[in-house]
């Protein structure tokens, strides 16, 4: 007669681990904070507000519900703004956001306005006292378990890059250094990219942070060349993965993706479906990060991002032949 041993502690530990891994991961929420700085005159104030509204409305159309817009002049659009973009209000907005964001949520921050650089540190110009790059670094440190996409479109924004770059962050600046202090053209094209079919190079119905960056940078270069001027701004992106991670970030929930491949030929449709599956794997891996060995997480992430980059290239190559 064969006897069976009663389940021991190891069995129950393994069972609990299996159940934890099998449980569906919580959905990632997207949070957007848009800040416009001092315009200096009515023309610039109006322009910065116009861009901010375009970003806010684009995000809301795609299902982003947590949107905060702090404006230099809230009276321009009381229905859309949540307050004036003073140092105090910006700090409060970051602190409030840190209080409601869950682990693995995605935080998008966009600065639209003028910047400055005193030779030592950069700042974004606000009504009243400014916030420096170091100040924003302190605010971003509140988000230890979220991914941050921080887009500073201002002049001299390159001074923010080294201060803010780090694990779990994608930093976009309109200039490469703090010394590039001329008014930037980058923001107009970056905002335009969010709703541009031309920017959606992989035709998945959404524009990634990398696609918006590449689109805007290319448009800026073309504009300077067309006018015969020397390029005075060099946009920069740092996500720690040579842009591979930025290619998976969207200012839109995953469920908002259009069925871009529905009418594609079978070969292209297959590539699009494979690319979408890889994006899903990246998202699921990020949700499991806290329960994984750091080295294994980085190894698996690097493989997925490389596979995703190759798949995206294959899609573009196939479309280019048509």
Tell me the role of every PLM-derived stretch:
Residues 7-8, 27:
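Low-complexity, intrinsically disordered short peptide segments enriched in small/polar/basic residues
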Residues 1-7:
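N-terminal secretory signal peptides that target proteins for export/translocation
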Residues 8-22:
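Bacterial N-terminal signal peptides
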Residues 2, 25-322:
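Cysteine endopeptidase catalytic domains of the caspase/legumain-like
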């Amino acid at each position: 007669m064969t006897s069976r041993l009663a389940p021991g502690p190891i069995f129950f530990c393994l069972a609990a681990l299996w159940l934890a891994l099998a449980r569906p991961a919580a959905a990632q929420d997207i949070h957007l904070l848009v800040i416009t700085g001092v315009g200096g005159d009515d023309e610039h104030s109006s322009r910065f507000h116009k861009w901010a509204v375009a970003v806010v409305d684009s995000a809301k159309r795609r299902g982003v519900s947590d949107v905060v817009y702090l404006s230099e002049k809230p009276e321009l659009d009381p229905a859309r703004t949540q307050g004036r973009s003073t140092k105090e209000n910006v700090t409060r907005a970051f602190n409030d956001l840190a209080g409601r964001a869950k682990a693995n949520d995605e935080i998008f921050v966009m600065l639209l306005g003028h910047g400055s650089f005193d030779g030592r540190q950069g700042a974004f110009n606000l009504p009243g006292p400014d916030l420096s790059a170091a100040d924003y670094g302190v605010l971003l440190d509140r988000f230890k378990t979220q991914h941050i996409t921080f887009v500073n479109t201002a002049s001299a924004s390159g001074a923010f890059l080294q201060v803010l770059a780090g694990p779990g962050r994608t930093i976009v600046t309109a200039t490469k250094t703090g010394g590039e202090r001329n008014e930037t053209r980058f923001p107009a094209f970056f905002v335009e990219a969010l709703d541009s079919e031309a920017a959606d190079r992989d035709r998945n119905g959404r524009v990634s942070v990398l696609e918006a960056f590449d689109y805007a940078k290319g448009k800026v270069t073309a504009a300077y060349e067309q006018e015969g001027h020397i390029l005075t701004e060099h946009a920069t992106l740092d996500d720690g993965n040579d842009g591979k991670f930025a290619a998976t970030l969207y200012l839109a929930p995953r469920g908002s993706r259009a069925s871009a491949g529905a009418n594609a030929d079978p070969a292209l449709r297959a590539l699009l479906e494979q690319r979408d599956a890889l994006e899903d794997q990246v998202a699921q891996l990020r949700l499991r990060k806290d329960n994984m060995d750091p080295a294994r997480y980085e190894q698996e992430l690097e493989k997925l991002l490389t596979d995703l980059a190759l798949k995206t290239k294959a899609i573009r190559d196939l479309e280019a032949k048509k």
